[in-house]
Regions:
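Bacterial Sec-dependent N-terminal signal peptides
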Residues: 1-21
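Mature extracytoplasmic enzyme cores
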Residues: 21-26, 31, 43, 47-49, ...
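Glycine-rich, proline-tolerant flexible connector loops at the mouths of alpha/beta enzymes
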Residues: 66-79
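Conserved residues at the C-terminal ends of beta-strands
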Residues: 39, 66, 250
Length: 317
């Protein structure tokens, strides 16, 4: 080894030593995090402490608590979600997280999507139910108008009954329906009558933890989302527990949740025309140009309501 090589090696060794000494501590947000499944919320202080110490030892910076269904045969150790005992173990977890340098995050619910025992059928995920009747005009018409799906009959609400002739004329017949019967002196011609019912998806929370079972909420309703979040406000306030570092949403896996109570009013205000005057085009599965444009407006309105009534309200909360 010549003199130049020896000098270079010495410089590299000194430089590496200086860099190692100057390297800053890695903050929690720069370290990896992990999902922390609480199976049945069957947890206790001793084991929570042990797990957090192990997470810290291996370099973890955050955990995301998600309560989920329990292990078969371990029911006796399960804790009801947001119960006083559940809040106790969460408070312990937060204290230990602070001690070990780990940020504690939490799902705003159990399993997925958001929902639970305090979600009433009124606040549950909502869908549109359309029924079509082809009627001959030029006479007094008496037609039964009722939702045919027996599972929807206890919950569905009649929203609109609209009539359309072959020339595109539209008449709102909602006021002519009394006790599930349409009574209408129809002008001559062939009429397509479309009834819109506001129904419920009846979807339940998937993989719910004990105390988290119930209907999925209506993410498109400002009132339903507010009511859902109020359960958390009460639990944290009554137990004097600090909110976690971050709340998160596991997923938005809702099925057929394509409507909300004031959707028609919201659509008219945002898109500048009444969707109910174009139900035939909206429901046309062959999708000509006008139908595609109407469906696009419908989807944009759904997007607006999801953003404003769920995402923004939840984030502001």
């Amino acid at each position: 080894m010549n003199k130049k090589q020896l000098i270079l090696l010495c410089m590299l060794a000194v430089g590496g030593s200086v860099q190692a000494q100057q390297w800053p501590d890695t903050p929690a947000e720069a370290r990896p995090g992990t999902r922390w499944w609480w199976l049945g919320s069957a947890v206790d202080e001793k084991n929570l402490t042990y797990n957090l110490e192990e997470y810290a030892r291996t370099g973890m910076g955050a955990v995301e608590i998600t309560p989920i269904y329990g292990v078969q045969g371990n029911d006796a150790n399960e804790i009801q979600f947001l119960s006083p005992r559940w809040m106790e173990v969460l408070k312990h977890t937060q204290a230990e997280g602070k001690r070990t340098g780990i940020e504690i995050d939490m799902n705003t619910g159990t399993g997925w999507p958001f929902g639970g025992p305090e979600v009433s059928i009124e606040d549950a995920a909502t869908k549109a139910i359309f029924q079509t009747y082809n009627l001959e005009g030029g006479k007094e018409i008496e037609q039964d108008i009722n939702v045919t799906d027996p599972k929807q009959q206890p919950y569905s609400i009649l929203s609109r009954v609209m009539a359309y002739d072959e020339k595109g004329k539209c008449i709102n017949l909602t006021a002519y329906v009394k006790k599930d019967k349409l009574q209408w002196k129809a002008p001559a011609g062939k009429w397509k009558v479309i009834a819109l019912y506001i129904g419920k998806t009846r979807q339940k929370v998937k993989r719910a933890a004990p105390g988290g079972e119930g209907y999925v909420m209506n993410h498109l309703s400002k009132k339903a989302v507010k009511n859902y979040l109020s359960r958390f406000d009460r639990a944290f306030k009554n137990s004097k527990t600090s909110y976690p570092h971050t709340f998160f949403n596991d997923s938005y896996e809702v099925y057929q949740a394509d409507w909300t109570d004031d959707f028609l009013e919201q659509f008219a205000r945002r898109r500048g025309y009444k969707l109910e005057e174009h139900f035939p085009e909206f429901l046309n599965e062959s999708r000509p140009e006008v139908s595609r444009r109407i469906v696009s407006d419908y989807r944009e309105t759904i997007s607006d309501l999801l953003l404003e009534n769920f995402t923004c309200q939840w984030t502001d909360w």
